[in-house]
Design a protein with these regions (language model features):
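Positively charged, solvent-exposed patches that mediate nucleic-acid binding
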Residues: 1-119
Length: 119
């Protein structure tokens, strides 16, 4: 796979992986997303996404947000340090255009780079 792919090894899948990030992660937030990141293994950046039904009511809206997050992560994964990242969508994300979601995520990726590079 190419450098901009999103293989299974780049995903957080297990509840214990999510719990570790929730307990130890550096937090970055804005109107659309809460992003938690903590130092991961040597395998590069890994992503977990949570979009609660309470935050985004329709399944189509939740899917759109998850696709936007995955696409942004996929394009920026090579720049990110070896971190485990969890992105939580807020209800405001459902009302935003995809371009606004991308801009928000780009800002969060910069925050992750700043906060996790030296730790």
């Amino acid at each position: 796979m190419g450098p901009a792919s999103f293989p299974r090894a780049a995903r957080l899948c297990l509840p214990t992986e999510f719990s570790r990030v929730f307990q130890n992660g550096a937090r970055s937030s804005d109107a659309c997303f809460v992003v938690l990141a903590c130092k991961g293994g040597a395998g590069g950046a890994r992503l977990g996404i949570t979009v609660a039904r309470k935050a985004v009511a329709g399944a189509a809206g939740r899917t759109r947000i998850k696709r936007a997050v995955r696409e942004s992560f996929r394009l920026n994964r090579e720049r990110l340090p070896a971190t485990d990242i969890v992105v939580q969508a807020r209800s405001a994300a459902a009302k935003r255009l995809n371009a606004e979601l991308r801009a928000s995520l780009d800002w969060h990726w910069q925050e992750v780079i700043k906060r996790c590079k030296d730790s």
